[in-house]
Structure formats: C-alpha cells, structure tokens
Design a protein with these regions (language model features):
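C-terminal binding/interaction regions
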Residues: 1-8, 12-15, 24, 32, ...
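Short, thiol/selenol-centered motifs that function as redox-active sites or metal-ligating centers
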Residues: 21, 43-52, 90
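Beta-strand scaffold of nucleotide-dependent catalytic cores
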Residues: 38-42
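Alpha-helical support elements that line or immediately flank enzyme active sites
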Residues: 48-63
C-alpha cells in the first residue's frame, strides 16, 4: 500500500470504524489553503479495505478539500479496477474517514471525538 502510516504533522484526522466487519481506518491530512498537500492512512481490516484507502490517498493528493469530499466509493472501486459485490462496503470506510477529516478541518479541529 502507498501512503500508509501515521502523519505526525497532520492538521486534519478522521477516524471511522465499521462494527459489522471490524474494519477501521484513520485518515491523516495535511491541508494548506484548502488543498490537500499530503495524506496518509492506517487501515486495520481486509485487503480490499486497505487497497481502497491506499488508492484514495493517491486520488485526493493535490485536490481541494471540496473536490476530495465529492469523491464516491464507486469512484474508488473503479480506480481499483472494480471490487466484488460483497467487498464494495470496504471502499466506504476510507471515504468516510476522509470526509470526517475534511469536516474536522472545516470546523477548525484536528480530530473530533464523535
């Protein structure tokens, strides 16, 4: 996976867990002037969840937070070349973590507790 690991100087962090399958993702963003300069992630889960989070980091680096927020799990799955139907939910956790990080950035907090 690309861009895997914690980012010490992230100014926006989103964390999401899926209680149904046990997967969890933390997305770390370094945002300057509403542009995502750097992004890393930590995903604990199946290979499809890790691959989806990894490709998502490649897709959003250099984009505005608005452009990144609009990305869909379908776009992530397409970028991977498709996912089996029963694994489509795995592409959602990275998107949700990214959106939570962007929401935290917009709200002026690095990480929220909800």
């Amino acid at each position: 996976p690309r861009n895997q690991g914690e980012m010490a100087d992230a100014n926006a962090i989103g964390e999401v867990s899926n209680p149904d399958c046990g997967d969890s993702t933390v997305m770390y963003l370094k945002v300057e002037n509403d542009i995502i300069q750097d992004v890393t992630f930590e995903t604990f889960g199946c290979a499809a969840a890790v691959a989806s989070s990894s490709i998502l980091t490649e897709m959003i680096k250099g984009k505005t937070v608005e452009e990144a927020y609009k990305l869909t799990e379908e776009a992530v799955a397409d970028e991977l070349g498709g996912l089996p139907e029963k694994k489509l939910h795995c592409s959602v956790i990275g998107i949700e973590a990214m959106r939570k990080a962007i929401a935290n950035y917009r709200n002026g907090v690095v990480r929220s507790d909800d």
